[in-house]
Amino acid sequence: MPLVKSLSKNSIYEIFSRFSKINPEPKGELEYTSAYTLLVAVVLSAQSTDIGVNKATRKLFELASTPEKMLLLGENRIIENIRTIGLYKNKAKNIVSLSQKLIDNFNSKVPKTHRELQSLAGVGRKTANVVLSMAFGVPTIAVDTHVYRVSNRTGIAIGKNVDEVEEQLIKRIPKKFFFHAHHWLILHGRYTCKARSPLCNECIISELCPSKLLN
């Protein structure tokens, strides 16, 4: 990833303004019907594609869409339904564990704080941020591989790790655009600013991007 300078506030505002104009209400691509099914889907999505996760969870969630039903389904049957997803054995254990803890500690409800969410098996800061944002409308920034890449390439937020990038994004994204920023950055990274062969000629922010100017 080339070394670039941080963008100015005006340039950052313009970038998110353009994202907003072409996609005013961006949505995540994981399929879910409740805070619980969202939590499970996000846990399953680690090192997996949303398409692959959705294919597995359509059947899984028909069988079990609550912590109680997931425990009744059991680890082996969970494995049967998510076998196409990477790290499926470990993820099945995490789903059983987090479901049990939700029942025991949270009255079967998905908690609404970082600390409580991260006490669940398989839930780190990124997963907690996604759940807080998508399930409860809390303005957060979850830095996945797409957000990290786009932030550094464009100079929106430069950091050596996801924590540094998250910290910079929180400081630098205009409040007007903060709630949807996570999804805009993910979608831009997934479909335009790809890891290999980014589509700079099709990019709506290319003339603002220092990485494009370096090429």
Residues of each region from the PLM?
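Catalytic cores of DNA base-excision repair glycosylases
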Residues: P2-N215
